[in-house]
Amino acid sequence: MNSPNESDGMSGREPSLEILPRTSLHSIPVTVEVKPVLPRAMPSSMGGGGGGSPSPVELRGALVGSVDPTLREQLLQQELLALKQQQQLQKQLLFAEFQKQHDHLTRQHEVQLQKHLKQQQEMLAAKQQQEMLAAKRQQELEQQRQREQQRQEELEKQRLEQQLLILRNKEKSKESAIASTEVKLRLQEFLLSKSKEPTPGGLNHSLPQHPKCWGAHHASLDQSSPPQSGPPGTPPSYKLPLPGPYDSRDDFPLRKTASEPNLKVRSRLKQKVAERRSSPLLRRKDGTVISTFKKRAVEITGAGPGASSVCNSAPGSGPSSPNSSHSTIAENGFTGSVPNIPTEMLPQHRALPLDSSSNQFSLYTSPSLPNISLGLQATVTVTNSHLTASPKLSTQQEAERQALQSLRQGGTLTGKFMSTSSIPGCLLGVALEGDGSPHGHASLLQHVLLLEQARQQSTLIAVPLHGQSPLVTGERVATSMRTVGKLPRHRPLSRTQSSPLPQSPQALQQLVMQQQHQQFLEKQKQQQLQLGKILTKTGELPRQPTTHPEETEEELTEQQEALLGEGALTMPREGSTESESTQEDLEEEDEEEDGEEEEDCIQVKDEEGESGAEEGPDLEEPGAGYKKLFSDAQPLQPLQVYQAPLSLATVPHQALGRTQSSPAAPGGMKSPPDQPVKHLFTTGVVYDTFMLKHQCMCGNTHVHPEHAGRIQSTWSRLQETGLLSKCERIRGRKATLDEIQTVHSEYHTLLYGTSPLNRQKVDSKKLLGPISQKMYAVLPCGGIGVDSDTVWNEMHSSSAVRMAVGCLLELAFKVAAGELKNGFAIIRPPGHHAEESTAMGFCFFNSVAITAKLLQQKLNVGKVLIVDWDIHHGNGTQQAFYNDPSVLYISLHRYDNGNFFPGSGAPEEVGGGPGVGYNVNVAWIGGVDPPIGDVEYLTAFRTVVMPIAHEFSPDVVLVSAGFDAVEGHLSPLGGYSVTARCFGHLTRQLMTLAGGRVVLALEGGHDLTAICDASEACVSALLSVELQPLDEAVLQQKPNINAVATLEKVIEIQSKHWSCVQKFAAGLGRSLREAQAGETEEAETVSAMALLSVGAEQAQAAAAREHSPRPAEEPMEQEPAL
């Protein structure tokens, strides 16, 4: 092998592979193709048939045998290295090209993006410019409209000024104005009505003889009052026309013409009156009548022979009649001592202006129409004024005049005058009082106007017309000059001498008889109810709830009661001034309402020995009744069975008792001291139907979970099961505002504790409250409420919420005083969410918190335990006692880490200040998966509630018994699966505290079946009725994980304050059966240890006796010798 061949072979192998030129690389971005040159020449060369120069492959094949394998391997390696270098170079070129293209596209995208942003900015600027132009155009249009409106106003003003100028500059011969068609028709009707022949129908009264009283008192003809309507058979009358200014120079309301002088008009009208007035009694033209209750017949007599009645004054006694020293005559009216009725103006009456000079209450004084004075102030001198008698008096009127004159002289009514059919009782005192102050008419007018307004808003109330006004008969001077007297505040004022007398006394007498018959029926009904109470008492029949028929009209008549004072049956209060506080007025009104309830409703408890003076509870001095009650040993003989370790110095209410004057309880029939009431010391139940009236004004109970059916169904369930017959029915009352203010603020108390009528007497500044606090909101149902679910009824809710508080107070005080063993209050609305100044969650006043406060203040109760097992946390109760160590609050509620209403009640909330540790929150977590049930509640009572309660050792236990944790309530209002039977067992456990003084108050719970079942179970437990045992599955079940975690956290927090709960931390996961077995083993171990210790002591004592030296034997006695 020579070198040329080798070199040729080497050189021939080099160009075997051809790399694509660089120009082609730019067109191929990713892949590189390497292919051999002359691929088709290989078969020809291999065939050997062709000629030509050999290819490198052929040469390589020819040199295969001659080339060394080592050298061939080196050649191949060199070729591979060259290929790798070429490929690496191509990759670099491709990456550079890719980077270049990427940069180019990026720059292009940025340019497009900037162009797009620029277009958007231009469009936004154009839009803003269009809006500015539109606003500017709108502003210009508004300004143009305003200018147009001002121009129209100026034109109208100029037109009116021109018309006025034309009227001012008119000629005297032209008319100043043209009357409209309506005015002409009204004037024509008025003149036609005057031209008709009047018939007798009433007295014709007018103003006294004074120049100013004979003026035109109407600015127009349509100012007369509309006619009133009333029952048939009552005498017609007129109402007070609207007051109008008058000119004393005008004599009559009709306009004078230039052709008729004053004297001609006066003489012609007098002649017309004399011709057409055949009787002084005139009938109302429109034929309407008015009830006799609003029209009081008036018959005022003088005191001597020189004075007589006003009735049927002479028709011709007009202004031109001569005056004398004994007679000052007012046509169709009355003067003298009659206007001077002694009266005492109430504060609201004094607000009306009194101006005798201008006589703002002047009346229409047409000579042919009757004038109703309504007790206007007399303008003549009192010392020179007397009454003149009509020349013709009917027999009945003459008899009435003699009767009144006899009364004024100190005599008595005899014969047919005893019925007082024609003499109202309110006028008897008037007839006896004599002359009064000269301002009697004006003040009486103001009083009557306010009284009429109150009467239009209330129903007819029967008021006895005799036996109410104190008849003063001593030292009466029978002259027209009498000392000024005062009308007692309690005397009911009515329409006085302004009303005409009826044609005959039959109508008024019939009304009096109806009123007396109605009173007789009410009294008979009350006696029958009392008699039925005695008959059913021994038979253990269930007592029906006390109804309040008068409560339906209570709120509407409160304004009238305020005007009438304290009522006709009470003594007049001396020294009453208008400086009385608002609180005293409201409490006085509440006393009157409670007094009415005491008269009309059945007495619930028969505690003999009460005096007749103790008819109603005195809410102002709450301890007076119990002080007298506990001082009497005979009626409290049954109370010696149970001694309450409480101080009974003051009690805020008085026990109800039957008076000795009742026909059903004669004075000679007294139960012997050794015969106690059979079921006195038992469970008390309180319920009142007035709480049913708290409901939404929409009337749809389906959209409101808290409705009246809750307590109504509970009461019915207790009746059906017979449990109510085993209980003592306690009558409730309305809580006073002072009692409510022990927990709530004054603004909150007045806002939700007063009705719209008695709220008028409250200072408006007290009702303003915080500016940020809104009062009411409109609900989707159409009613109103304080929030989305707490409804409010403006007429009845205030009384209902106060009744709920008062019912619980009555029951709790009787239990604390030892009269009852325990109690269950069926009340609504609930109260444990109500805070000091906030109403929420169906709650307005916190009944349980108020009761706890008053038990401590009035009965000196030391420690109170409040257990709240409502599924919602009682945020209001916790707030009231958060810093109070004398009240222990334990709540079991659904918490869910603050995600369940109301969001409060975390386990870390343990109290503040001196009350740290006296607030225990068992706050369940985990939602309703799984739901909390009987096992969890019983475990909480076993490990937390009862140990802490026993260590606290309360005097009274109050339970906020909400039953919305009972199965049947959906998740928003409940969601747990506690059975009603479980709450009976929880109640039984609580009865081991405080000597059994446990009071349950109904709180939440909106499923009727659930709350009825739970209430039945709780009342059965309170009555010590054998309860249905728990299921074995419940006793074997273990608490769920969420409940165990909750109780572990509560024990960890509360163990710092109550060491008794520490020992239960280890056994939280055990079932009730296992826990009972463990406690039994522990108890047996303790007992065995105690027995062993006792046995050891006895053995030691025996051994000591054996080792001790025997005492010296005493010599035996010698027997006597036989």
Curated annotation (Swiss-Prot):
It is an enzyme of class 3 (hydrolase). Phosphorylated by AMPK, CaMK1, SIK1 and PRKD1 at Ser-259 and Ser-498. The phosphorylation is required for the export to the cytoplasm and inhibition. Phosphorylated by the PKC kinases PKN1 and PKN2, impairing nuclear import. Phosphorylated by GRK5, leading to nuclear export of HDAC5 and allowing MEF2-mediated transcription. Ubiquitinated. Polyubiquitination however does not lead to its degradation. It comes from Pongo abelii. Pfam families: HDAC4_Gln (PF12203), Hist_deacetyl (PF00850). Residues 312-327, 494-504 have a biased composition (Low complexity). GO terms for biological process: chromatin organization; negative regulation of transcription by RNA polymerase II; regulation of myotube differentiation. This is Histone deacetylase 5. Residues 684-1028 are annotated as: Histone deacetylase. It comes from the Eukaryota. One of its GO terms (molecular function) is histone deacetylase activity, hydrolytic mechanism. The lineage of its organism: Eukaryota, Metazoa, Chordata, Craniata, Vertebrata. The gene is HDAC5. The keyword Ligase does not apply. Belongs to the histone deacetylase family. HD type 2 subfamily. The modification Phosphoserine is found at S259, S498, S611, S661, S1108. It catalyses: N(6)-acetyl-L-lysyl-[histone] + H2O = L-lysyl-[histone] + acetate. The keyword Cytoplasm applies. Its EC number is 3.5.1.98. Interacts with AHRR, BAHD1, BCOR, HDAC7, HDAC9, CTBP1, MEF2C, NCOR2, NRIP1, PHB2 and a 14-3-3 chaperone protein. Interacts with BCL6, DDIT3/CHOP, GRK5, KDM5B and MYOCD. Interacts with EP300 in the presence of TFAP2C. Interacts with ANKRA2. Interacts with CUL7 (as part of the 3M complex); negatively regulated by ANKRA2. Interacts with ZBTB7B; the interaction allows the recruitment of HDAC4 on CD8 loci for deacetylation and possible inhibition of CD8 genes expression. Interacts with RARA. The modification N6-acetyllysine is found at K533. The nuclear export sequence mediates the shuttling between the nucleus and the cytoplasm. Residues 581-621 have a biased composition (Acidic residues).
